[in-house]
Design a protein with these regions (language model features):
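Positively charged, phosphate-engaging catalytic surfaces used for nucleic-acid and nucleotide handling
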Residues: 2-6, 12-204
Length: 204
């Protein structure tokens, strides 16, 4: 079974003229990636453009881009502690998610009806903010406690998540409604469209 890389290499090797549009697209994507390596700001601009095309609000996009930065700071901290990318990243992320949301990452994705989609891309603004709080707090606790082993890092991840978990419970107590929602990107896009349509009707 071919993976994504294998499929792309197969397309490149096809001599048929029908494959030319795909080859041109691959070349364009490659050029964009090189440009982004030279000027990282292009990555942010491209992400902003992509989210806008998907129908997200600017408020949500600003939070999402900030969440990317918070996540990067956390993974940089993990790297400095010897945490391995892949399985160990996933375990620590799961620890954080479970501590603040009460669910594992998989359970959270199931709630939103997701398979391979990015969970953060399907969070509400408040969910994103709490997830950021959990990750940013984990980073700060790690810097202070200087964990030496993976077990230590796991404890720190749980502590960071619990801070955001307490904030979530406080919000829910004060608002009388759950923070975590089954709504995903499709629902958010539809909501934005409805608001735009309503405003348009008012101005007609």
């Amino acid at each position: 079974i071919l993976n994504t890389k294998g499929i792309l290499r197969l397309i490149e090797s096809v001599p048929s003229p029908k494959a030319e549009p795909f080859k041109m697209w691959l070349a364009e994507v490659g050029r964009e990636r090189i440009d982004e390596t030279i000027d990282p700001e292009l990555t942010i601009e491209r992400a902003l453009e992509t989210y806008l095309k998907k129908g997200y609000s600017r408020e949500w996009i600003n939070q999402r881009l900030q969440a990317i930065q918070v996540r990067k700071e956390l993974t940089d901290e993990w790297d400095s502690r010897g945490v391995k990318q892949g399985v160990e990243y996933a375990i620590l992320t799961d620890e954080i998610t479970k501590a603040w949301s009460g669910m594992t990452t998989r359970q959270y994705k199931n709630l939103k009806g997701l398979t391979k989609e990015n969970l953060r891309d399907n969070m509400s603004t408040l969910e994103l903010v709490l997830n950021m709080l959990a990750e940013a707090t984990t980073t700060e606790i790690s810097k202070e406690k200087n964990p030496q082993t993976f077990v230590d890092n796991r404890k720190v991840a749980k502590e960071g998540g619990e801070v955001a978990g307490n904030a979530r419970k406080d919000i829910e107590e004060r608002t009388g409604k759950p923070v975590i929602t089954s709504k995903n990107a499709v629902d958010f896009s539809n909501l934005i469209s409805d608001v735009i349509d309503t405003e348009y009707d008012k101005n007609e």
